[in-house]
Design a protein with these regions (language model features):
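The feature marks the mature, well-folded catalytic cores of soluble enzymes
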Residues: 1-137
Length: 137
C-alpha cells in the first residue's frame, strides 16, 4: 500500500497517536510517494527540505520511492541550489532548513566484504515523475 506525505502533522498532544500510527504505516509500506523541492540536473539528485509537518521516512523506509516534481523545479547544480535556498525565504533564516535530504538514486553499498547490496540504507528502487504542465487541457 503506497504512503503519501500530506505535510500536515501537528505538534499537538493528541496528534502523537496519529504520528505513531502514521509511522507504523510508513514502516510497513512497500511504496512511498513524495514530492521534492528541487532536482539537480547535473547529478539527477532530488532535494527534499525537512520542514515542520514533513516526514523524511517516506523517502527512506519503503522499498520503492516514487517522487513527483514539476519541470520548473529542475535546476542546474549545487551552487544554483544554494542561491535558490538563500533567496526563497526571509532573513535571517532564508530558505535554509535544519536538514536537507539529497537523494541521487536507490540505496546501495559495498562496504561489507565488498559485496554490492541494494536497499541497505534506503529504497531499493527510485522513480521520478516530472509534470510538464498543470494547466487544464
Amino acid at each position: 500500500v503506497p504512503v503519501y506525505s500530506p505535510r500536515q502533522i501537528n505538534a499537538e498532544p493528541e496528534s502523537t497517536n496519529k504520528r505513531s500510527s502514521f509511522r507504523r504505516r510508513v514502516e510497513t509500506a512497500f511504496i512511498g510517494i513524495t514530492s521534492a523541492d528541487y532536482c539537480l540536473a547535473e547529478t539527477a539528485t532530488l532535494v527534499m527540505k525537512t520542514v515542520p509537518g514533513s516526514d523524511r521516512s517516506i523517502s527512506l523506509l519503503p522499498s520503492i520511492h516514487v517522487a513527483v516534481i514539476e519541470l520548473n523545479q529542475i535546476i542546474r547544480n549545487l551552487p544554483e541550489l544554494y542561491a535558490c535556498l538563500k533567496y526563497e525565504g526571509k532573513p535571517p533564516d532564508w530558505g535554509l532548513t535544519n536538514c536537507l535530504t539529497l537523494i541521487s538514486g536507490p540505496s546501495k553499498t559495498a562496504d561489507i566484504e565488498l559485496t554490492m547490496v541494494h536497499g541497505a540504507h534506503g529504497p531499493r528502487e527510485l522513480y521520478l515523475y516530472v509534470i510538464t504542465s498543470t494547466a487544464a487541457a
